Every structure is written in C-alpha cells, then in structure tokens.
C-alpha cells in the first residue's frame, strides 16, 4: 500500500547497539525483527564503521557490521538536504545529528519510527513531530 508508514529510521546510536555489547541490544533486536524496511542517512555507514574500528572488532565482526549496513537503505545527502540540516532547530544540535534528522524528515508520513538513543537528537526529532523510540 503506497504511502503507508512502514519505514524505520536508525541513527548511529541505535545501529552501534547491534554490534557493540550493550544491555539494550536485545530489546532493539526484538523491535526491529518484524520491521523489514530500515533506512538511514548514508553517513551511517561511515559512523558505524568508525565505531566498529574504535571498538577493535575482529574481521568476522566487521563483516557482520557490513552485513547490517547492507540491510539498510542508505539515503545520500544532496545540497538541499545539507541546507535543510544546517537550519534545523535547536541550534545546539550537532551537524551529523542534524543530517540524520533532515534525512528522516524527508521521508514524511512513510516514517513509522525514528530509532535513536541520543537524547538531544530524540528531543529535536520529537519537536518536529517524528515518532521517536528507544527500545530498552
């Protein structure tokens, strides 16, 4: 059914919980299991691989991270999205978080959930009316 809310947006604070030991990972896995359409900004790929590198993951675990990323539709930023991200409120929102937020906002009513564990980003997303969740 076109236009129905079926997309789940993941920011890096959510995805990292799936490959770095975290007590909330199981709740997130359960939340995501029935939801096949996962999306994020293209910058998620870099953020996730940097986090995995900082965590010192082994090559097999790095392959798992890449497999997780391959299961997410990544949306590239263009100049218009960059401009939109640059003026989002609040002014204290960090640049990469504003890119995540602008990308999620671009999905409109198709967005079923915006998954983040970053409180500042969650607050901003709620202010814009996004359906924020942090399964725990």
Where are these regions (language model features)?
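Acidic catalytic patch
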Residues: 70-91, 98-102
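Short, well-structured N-terminal submotif of metal-dependent ribonuclease cores
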Residues: 1-40, 54-67, 136
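Alpha-helix capping/helix-boundary segments
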Residues: 14-15, 44, 81, 100, ...
């Amino acid at each position: 059914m076109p236009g129905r809310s079926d997309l789940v947006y993941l920011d890096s604070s959510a995805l990292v919980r799936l490959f770095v030991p975290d007590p909330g990972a199981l709740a997130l896995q359960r939340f995501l299991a029935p939801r096949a359409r996962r999306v994020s900004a293209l910058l998620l790929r870099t953020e996730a691989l940097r986090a995995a590198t900082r965590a010192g993951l082994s090559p097999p675990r790095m392959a798992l991270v890449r497999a997780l990323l391959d299961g997410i539709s990544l949306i590239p930023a263009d100049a218009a999205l960059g401009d939109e991200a640059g003026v989002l409120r609040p002014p204290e929102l960090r640049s990469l978080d504003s890119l995540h937020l602008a990308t999620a906002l671009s999905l409109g009513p198709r967005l079923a959930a915006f998954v983040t564990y970053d409180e500042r980003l969650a607050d901003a997303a709620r202010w814009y009316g996004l359906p924020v969740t942090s399964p725990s």
